[in-house]
Amino acid sequence: VITANPNITVMFAPYDEFAKGVKIAVDEAGMSGQVSIYSADISTADIAAMREPGSAWKATAATNPAVVGEVSVRALAMLMAGEDPGAQVIVPPTLITQQQLNDGNITNMEELAAKLPAFAHADVAAPDWMPLPSAPSQN
């Protein structure tokens, strides 16, 4: 796709594993300077790929898997207490940019959660009677 369409300037990958493949293709085509990659989802390996010098992978929107689990347990607790968490419980994604990762010297998921509070917590499925976890300390 990339070599057949040399005027491509932006690629979107709806999943981080797809973004890894797009990045490899862009790198192999020597087009890292002209193509910007945007995606959804993140992992420690993705952070490393985004932070590579000259990386075309510019940003991703993601939710923290630990927070998704936390919210799921809270929604279950609400159901067990006879409360309705709603038909959908949506954990808002966080925009994570290459610049944030580089400026914050973020190299893994733990550092990402510590340095981007929006990635570390979600105020959904949180009734008044349920204590929320403490926000991680910022380093």
Predicted regions and their residues:
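Hinge/cleft segment of the Venus flytrap/periplasmic-binding protein
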Residues: N64, V68-N139
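Generic structural signal for alpha-helix termini and adjacent loop/cap motifs
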Residues: A4, P53, L79-E83
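Short beta-strand elements at the ligand-binding edges of bilobed clamshell
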Residues: E52-A66
